[in-house]
UniProtKB/Swiss-Prot annotation:
UniProt-listed Enzyme Commission number(s): 3.4.24.-
PROSITE patterns: ZINC_PROTEASE
UniProt cofactor note: Binds 1 zinc ion per subunit.
Binding, Zn(2+): 437, 441
Organism per entry: Trichophyton tonsurans
Keyword match Zinc: yes
Protein role: Secreted metalloproteinase probably acting as a virulence factor.
Compartment(s) of residence: Secreted
GO cellular component: extracellular region
GO molecular function: metalloendopeptidase activity; zinc ion binding
Disulfide bonds: none
Protein's name according to its UniProt entry: Extracellular metalloproteinase 4
Amino acid sequence: MHGLLLAGLLALPLNVLAHPTESHSSGISRRAIDITSYRLPQISKYTKSDAVPKQDDESFTTSSTGDDNVSSGDYVTTATDWLKKTLPKATYRLVNDHYIGDSGIGHVHFRQTAHGIDIDNTDFNVNIGRDGKVFSFGNSFYDGEIPKANPMVKRDFSDPVNALQVAIQTLNLPVTAKPENVKAKPVEGKENFKFEGTSGAFSDPKAQLVYLQKDGGLVPSWKVETDIGDNWLLTYVDANKNDKVHSVVDYVSAAEYKVYPWGINDPTEGNRTSIHLPWFKTLSTDWHIDGKGWYSTTRGNNAIAQENPTGGPEYENNYRPKSPLFIFKYPYSEAMTPPSSYRDASITQLFYTTNVYHDVLYILGFNEKAGNFQVNNWNKGGVGGDFAILNSQDGSGVNNANFATPPDGQPGRMRMYTWNASTPERDGCFEAGIVIHEYTHGVSNRLTGGPANSRCLAALESGGMGEGWSDFFATAIRLKAGDTRATDYTMGEWASNRPNGIRKYRYSTNLTTNPHMYVDADGLTSVHAIGTIWASMLYELLWNLIDKHGKGDVTKVRPVLKNGVPTDGRHLAMKLVLDGMALQPCLPNFVQARDAILDADKVLTQGSNKCEIWKAFAKRGLGVGAVFNPSKRTGSNELPAGC
């Protein structure tokens, strides 16, 4: 769910093998339905910090108290006033996911409304600087004529049960909803329902009446939510006639432990070792406690890991290893077969890798307020109740992985498959890059557009960047002490048994090895192909910052920060990319995401890395003169003055 985007389905993050993904359970047939034609339009605008109008009016300054409580801090009021001044005729609601990030920037998100109904693909995000003024903002509000008739008064919209049936039939969903059996039960909110009496979905489908901004107008629509495992869909069905699907969003985008330690990507890079008490002691808890009790198994505050051979929705009662002494040491070798013979080692590895990554990201700013995955948020903000569900050896497919990301407060779900391109087959849990790739889908979807909005990477180029961010973090984390900018890396090489990995090119700073440029995105319809271009740019950024600041001690797991700034170039690049996600608008494009990274550096280091960032992007055609157009992009190698 890339933001309820399942990194799966038509854009399975690691499925670029010659043969299609095999599926043994639920999901949309790849041959029958192509939901890419239903993508949301890319209409967001981002006003970077340099372009924000001067704020002389005292009404747009606040005291920077550092307190992100709405009742005592003014940053939400400042953001609201800015929206009123920018779009005085707009009606809207405040989304309840605002927070002050660890860089000191306040992030506030709004949703446009009409007649009290959400216009679901309209967002306005305001970033408030430490000085209390507007730092930057994004906007995709509808600026056309609002329908005069209030559908809530006339009740001239269709039955939500019919909308559910249209979604099922149009998308060929494996859900049964017979009219005589299905009841639409009202839940909290205007025209908001949960369907009872269906079968085939992982949870009861839902529907909410919304407007959708499309083709220059507003279309009343039922937003039908169906979780079918491989896909977690928001299907926008015409609410007037129930005869058309307007758009589709998919949320799915992919003690002591004997494991491949952090930094070892796969069995070709090192050996399994015993790791004792690996969690960061200054964080809230260790990995096996959630405030309610201790779990002597692969369960805790951040994640719950288990096998899932059937590929079904149940997980709480599935098998997971237990150790009263919290010693999770189980046999594994590449020669072992079948995979079920080493399920304990697989589950333990998945639990370990995910928890370490959670802790690293926490230090870099992806914490409770920012929408991370935790059952207990320890009164530090955000919405709890949402650890990551980790399914090892998931039986719903092979040769792939995916991650479903609903909004903050609902658990994310990772499905890790086995790969059959080798003999014996291989388990993706033992390739850290795949696990990190999938979990990063959860990160990018929670940060972009705010933790409560999981559809902000649903446009084609936005979704491509989602794949690129996932590849970037997986690659940055596996760097070795002897690596230089001449070092190239693949993705998915071990699991897929392909020497060149599963991307078109290796990640490289050499333009012969990897010639990708910004304009290569023209004509592409695959988020993974677009993502490789974005990740190639970020790989350039990574090495520019490492060359300036060093890569630090790569044998150390915990990032080292001084005054909130990573002291090495590797973690600095990761931090700037994370902060950029929180700044950029909903449904961003390459140009906007680049500007957000530059703005992130301006906040974090007062712009001291401006030229390193510009040189990275300009090298691959995203320089000063680059212009986004979905059909014909304009490339540029131009650098700003002074660089």
